[in-house]
Amino acid sequence: MDYKKVTEDLVKWVGDYAKKVGAKGFIFGLSGGIDSAVIAAIAKRVFPDNSLGLIMPCDSIEKDREDALKVAKAINLEIKTIDLTSTFEELMKASFTSENKMARSNIKPRLRMTTLYYYAQDLGYLVLGPSNASEWYLDYSTKYGDSGADIMPIANILKTDIFEIAKELGLPEFIINKKPSAGLWVGQTDEDEMGFTYEVLDSYVRGEKVPEKEIKEKIDRMHKNSSHKRVMAPKFEI
């Protein structure tokens, strides 16, 4: 793959879409991970003065916030920090008492989505989503959370290719080398939670063989079980 050309084409595609719909700028969450960093760098190339990154800690890992700040500084990105921790905690105390770890954790990206759309509507900006093709295949995301966006620039780019795109965009090495994580809880990583590496997943998505039968079956199962996330809600036809 010619990563330089892909990066140039990607930036142009995003810019063309923004022009087509009359967007005044872009807004997105800046999580401290590589996907949001790539989104931020693309946004800055299209709208150098009208790109806003929201850092939205929500009972989050401090290191992620620090990394998000470093990325913003590296690309000279305008940012706004909105701490959603107290909002999350109040919801937990008042309404959501279940000990289901995933159900509780998924509230966080949904709060962030709500915050992003408040500012997007106020500013006339489009919300950029950070989902990549590897996550999209499994829909390793929160429905109506981080998957809620107006445009998904990297949704057709596999995770292993995202690292190369990041290099083309001039992002700092620390973010390229950081272990992918949704930051849902301390110590959580994508690959630990999935049970296989992105290299294995991407090879399978490309049509290559997966060495272990159990992993292939798990990927197939996750793809099937998450199919409802990749389509609009079904409607009864009269």
Regions found by a protein language model. Give the residues of each.
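Conserved G/P- and acidic residue-centered "switch" motifs that form tight phosphate/ATP-binding loops
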Residues: 33
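A short, conserved alpha-helix within the catalytic core of class I
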Residues: 113
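Short, surface-exposed alpha-helical segments at coil->helix boundaries
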Residues: 36-40, 62-69
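Catalytic-core regions of hydrolytic enzymes
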Residues: 110
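ATP/NTP-dependent adenylation/nucleotidyl-transfer catalytic domains that generate, transfer
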Residues: 3-26, 41-45, 49-52, 59-60, ...
